[in-house]
Amino acid sequence: MSNSAKSVVILAAGKGTRMYSQLPKVLHKLAGKSMVQHVIDTAKSLGAQQTHLVYGHGGELMKETLGSQPVNWVLQAEQLGTGHAMQQAAPFFADDEDILMLYGDVPLITKETLERLIAVKPAGGIGLLTVILDNPMGYGRIVRENGDVVGIVEQKDASEEQLKIKEINTGILVANGGDLKRWLAKLDNNNAQKEYYITDIIALAHQEGRKIETAHPTRHSEMEGVNNRLQLAALERIYQTEQAERLLLEGVMLLDPARFDLRGTLTHGKDVVIDTNVIIEGEVTLGNNVEIGTGCVLKNCVIGDGSIISPYTVIEDANLAQECTVGPFARLRPGAQLADKAHVGNFVEMKKASLGVGSKAGHLTYLGDTEVGANVNIGAGTITCNYDGANKFKTIIGDDVFIGSDTQLVAPVCVANGATIGAGTTLTKDVNENELVISRVKQTHISGWKRPVKKKQ
């Protein structure tokens, strides 16, 4: 923010009755993050020195959910309008700082639009964010005289002539703290709703001869609020469309932009291809020439250059080096690490496990608390038995090891370089280099065996 605009107020006390939810309205998520968190993050991006969060309904849950956020919690015990909400925060305003007012249920407002608003605010006056709508129904109208803003009239209080005005108030404004405190003290509730409107300060400022300058958002969606789940879903689609368009323009190939969800941050290289119905959560990095198959979910992971993730794979808190292949239907859980050219096939699950250079776990395998060296083959049905019901134990497999199908490795256990484990083995002791270990039951042949025959009832 500019040197004079140091604090932000976020109004977030509403119950959200039309959401039909026990969750406070502003905690409902858009793109995997609560609406109010979007606004808090925008305030941070402006460099706000202090953020005042006005809360009411569901206060304990609000604090539990957002407790780690560096905000000043301001209680609005009764919801008596936006002006009343600002009155609760006013004691925290410094006279010589500018105050930017935002809303916890208007999540798509951008840093760029707010910087424009702050820039137009005149000394001693108000910067007001407005927008022109073909259908302004339901919004407060901007009243001008000779081009100057002189007031705002709410829909329910507007005259027939005022209802024809298409310039509407978004509710977002910036003003000096000392001026705000003076104007807020003069508000009354002499209106149809019997509420204290923050918009009434516009007329008060005009009466003092103060200038009100306006700015407009880059996109209309920036000023759209949420009162019900239908509106939230609509904003979700708008947000996802904007993210998809941005990624396409940056060179990411989304095979169907309408079927892609970004619920975090995606950092990408060149020639990345993402198929349909992929969900990105948290912080995800995709290297050059990465391919992501349909239906994959990627969360807080790094995928190296040239790696291919086949359909319906879930990767969370994992790191993949270059030219890895994973899936389809694989699951890499937190702590999974794949070295260059490692392969994880269908129905393989890894947790706190690493796979060395060129190693393969092709199918139907669980690797937990396991270190696997280079050029290892893990046969189908291999299980590392890492949990005894109380504690976890580690399995270590060296380089150039062959693990036969249907092997159970009962941790803690180590398999040294070059060892071979025969199919069907239950391994309970360490294996030396280049040893062959087989523990299956001796095969028995019985000639002329006759199967039992069911008795007829």
UniProtKB/Swiss-Prot annotation:
InterPro entries found in the cross-reference section: Bifunctional_GlmU (IPR005882), GlmU-like (IPR050065), GlmU_C_LbH (IPR038009), Hexapep (IPR001451), Hexapep_transf_CS (IPR018357), MobA-like_NTP_Trfase (IPR025877), Nucleotide-diphossugar_trans (IPR029044), Trimer_LpxA-like_sf (IPR011004)
Positions with a binding annotation for Mg(2+) = 105, 227
Q: In which pathway does it act?
A: Nucleotide-sugar biosynthesis; UDP-N-acetyl-alpha-D-glucosamine biosynthesis; N-acetyl-alpha-D-glucosamine 1-phosphate from alpha-D-glucosamine 6-phosphate (route II): step 2/2; Nucleotide-sugar biosynthesis; UDP-N-acetyl-alpha-D-glucosamine biosynthesis; UDP-N-acetyl-alpha-D-glucosamine from N-acetyl-alpha-D-glucosamine 1-phosphate: step 1/1; Bacterial outer membrane biogenesis; LPS lipid A biosynthesis
The species is Proteus mirabilis (strain HI4320)
Active site feature: 363
Q: State the residue spans of region: Linker.
A: 230-250
Residues noted as binding UDP-N-acetyl-alpha-D-glucosamine in the record, renumbered to the chain: 11-14, 25, 76, 81-82, 103-105, 140, 154, 169, 227, 333, 351, 366, 377
Catalytic reaction(s) noted: alpha-D-glucosamine 1-phosphate + acetyl-CoA = N-acetyl-alpha-D-glucosamine 1-phosphate + CoA + H(+); N-acetyl-alpha-D-glucosamine 1-phosphate + UTP + H(+) = UDP-N-acetyl-alpha-D-glucosamine + diphosphate
Functional summary from the UniProt entry: Catalyzes the last two sequential reactions in the de novo biosynthetic pathway for UDP-N-acetylglucosamine (UDP-GlcNAc). The C-terminal domain catalyzes the transfer of acetyl group from acetyl coenzyme A to glucosamine-1-phosphate (GlcN-1-P) to produce N-acetylglucosamine-1-phosphate (GlcNAc-1-P), which is converted into UDP-GlcNAc by the transfer of uridine 5-monophosphate (from uridine 5-triphosphate), a reaction catalyzed by the N-terminal domain.
Q: Does the keyword Cell membrane apply?
A: no
The free-text note explaining how the cofactor binds reads: Binds 1 Mg(2+) ion per subunit.
Annotated segments matching region Pyrophosphorylase: 1-229
The protein's name is Bifunctional protein GlmU
To which protein family does this belong? In the N-terminal section; belongs to the N-acetylglucosamine-1-phosphate uridyltransferase family.
Its quaternary organisation is: Homotrimer.
Where it mainly occurs, coarsely classed, is: cytoplasm
Task: Print the keywords alphabetically.
Answer: Acyltransferase, Cell shape, Cell wall biogenesis/degradation, Cytoplasm, Magnesium, Metal-binding, Multifunctional enzyme, Nucleotidyltransferase, Peptidoglycan synthesis, Repeat, Transferase
Q: Which GO terms describe its biological process?
A: cell morphogenesis; cell wall organization; lipid A biosynthetic process; peptidoglycan biosynthetic process; regulation of cell shape; UDP-N-acetylglucosamine biosynthetic process
Q: Please, which domain of life does this record's source organism belong to?
A: Bacteria
